[in-house]
């Protein structure tokens, strides 16, 4: 769904109307507007290709958990605090950059291998389509994890915190075109 399409105009009017309608509804600290915006953002992202929703969910879950585990290491303190935080930062970086690198560069490396060694590795070509916005949300989720690792912020907690973090990652107006937000904007 392109921003200048009729489909987006209809989508935007519906989302704006629902956002306004849910303005006053709040329960247990959960804002209905945030839930609606998250659902709309996932719909928007899934509209391109529903299979890519799993990628954004994986990035969101990995970084949410990594942030919580790093905070546990920070709160435990001690001289080995950094040693206990580092595996969670590495897990976040490997997962996020691994997904980004796979989708962005896999076919390039297969083609380079074919050209360099004169072999036919056509069976390895996956004809992958680059998921829309993967660079933006990858670096955005990583900024969250890095800020927690550097102790510049504390992670969000609980399921309401998770929903807020998921919305921070997937918010549809900035998901496919940026800008990449700092985690402190959460």
Residues covered by each model-derived region:
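Membrane-embedded transmembrane alpha-helical bundles that form the catalytic cores
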Residues: 1-186
